[in-house]
């Protein structure tokens, strides 16, 4: 459960760095383009995390480097660190167990299943905004405590893996048996720009739970991981928090049992910190002065640390053994009567009025206090459905332990994608449905098999449009955020993907490809679907006068329906796919922005997006067979006609609907309608950056380059989920 400081209610601003006034003449200063045009298309989102920002270079292989790691020694060092209390940030009860669990939780807890973004997979807690979120107060200290260990092991362990492993080791050190740990999270070197954290301009702005279902947001307030621990909008009412808790945990794909287990398990250890009013707390790390060296929230209250620490403003210790695993959370929750009170900082919390003083003080062994809980902890007792689960865990501690172990593993690995990406000696053998499991390959097609399959596909009567469209439909579900989707598994043939409106082509094409599969009884349908795209593109390139062999990596397998979580895969259904000129809803951003969103999920660069759209238009791959954007008189030929005709000044474009979504291109002299288009087409002529790219492919000398670039980008998309090739 998230804890937060409710006094951080405005965006942080650092002090002016100028000593003598005047204008800032440094690079990047001054009024920017987005200041003038705030709705400017974010093409820059496709350029983040390039090799230009990576100090390790493009040849660095994290999996190879991790294989050199002394994993046992690393865990030993982490265990020793847990009780190595530092005077600059003393450990509660002499242990950093609670702090490291919170660090791992808050790193993973930003994940949202609706768009697959967020999570712990990139080590984003090092960067703004997460490093300075109100809910992450004092986690800068946790990361700084880990630095000597990171320094020792260098690139053999990423920050992203280290954060989660530290949380696991903390749990194990408390006596808890975890479900396992999978490494494989690779660091990035700059903040993620694509994650939509919300449009609020003030920290802790309240959001209604119903609104969370309509947007890719994971928390009920800007700057929180989950919910306000004082109740919705500081209501102090446990029962009113139930909807918010379900909404936020549900956005991570957690059900009620997993939610109860995570809240209770996370609050079995450690404490919150609210020694005094938040007015004593200084600037967050991003706004702190340069001499603070990346640390923030310096406190002027007392020593500012230890017993005087202020983190969330709440002062809660849940259990009698805050550094050792127990079932005391549930025992205390149901054993005592709880009355609303306030922390020394003024935050709303609850105290067990009829309990003896049984909670140890974190720094004075001679002192004890009554059990305390957050408003949202009591939700587990007063919400009828949560209460049933909580009472079961109260009476069956082993069931609670098992549920928390699995839920914690899911929380910390949810954004890693299939288990093929996991590395390390503690990867669990069990396949879990949320990992989108795949069967083991039974057969690897030979080169002769591939030649015969291509011949069968070519002779099947399928059109170029159908072959290319079905391959794209299969592969384009991939999401770079949580590594879900893609062509491996042939889930296009399963529910729910086979029934999506955007995949209408599958109903016509898959039966043909399935018949071809039956004749071989060896190759997977997943491989055959991708191979159909290969055949279609090679035919289209040949028709354009370019002979090219499209690379194909066999080895895909076919998933079963029972390996496919229909509810979770439903989240992969696109709101829009500009590559196929598909748009389901008009109430979510602009068509061109959603094209950028889709391209970013597919990890495409701006040039790759541009060449793919141009190629797919002339191949006639619109989801509904429309002629929108098909700026060619020779469909099925892999030509540069899309770009040449879009940029041709003979045509004038005007909208044909009130929403400005559909357009006609008329001959300026005759008034004749030559082409029709959507915003996903015209953006390549209207946006200055995309027009510059389109001009490259519209030039007379670009034909062969266009085909080669299209094939390279196409193969990239087809192989995005081939983690078996790593």
From Swiss-Prot:
Q: Which cofactor does it need?
A: heme b
Q: Please give the superkingdom of this protein's source.
A: Bacteria
Q: Which reaction does it catalyse?
A: H2O2 + AH2 = A + 2 H2O; 2 H2O2 = O2 + 2 H2O
Q: Which Pfam families match?
A: peroxidase
Task: Tell me how the cofactor is bound.
Answer: Binds 1 heme b (iron(II)-protoporphyrin IX) group per dimer.
> Could you tell me one molecular function GO term of this UniProt entry?
metal ion binding
Alphabetical keyword list: Heme, Hydrogen peroxide, Iron, Metal-binding, Oxidoreductase, Peroxidase
EC number(s) stated in the UniProt entry for this protein: 1.11.1.21
Q: Where is this site: Transition state stabilizer?
A: 102
Please give the subunit comment from the record: Homodimer or homotetramer.
Q: Family, per the entry?
A: Belongs to the peroxidase family. Peroxidase/catalase subfamily.
Name of protein: Catalase-peroxidase
Source species, please? Salmonella schwarzengrund (strain CVM19633)
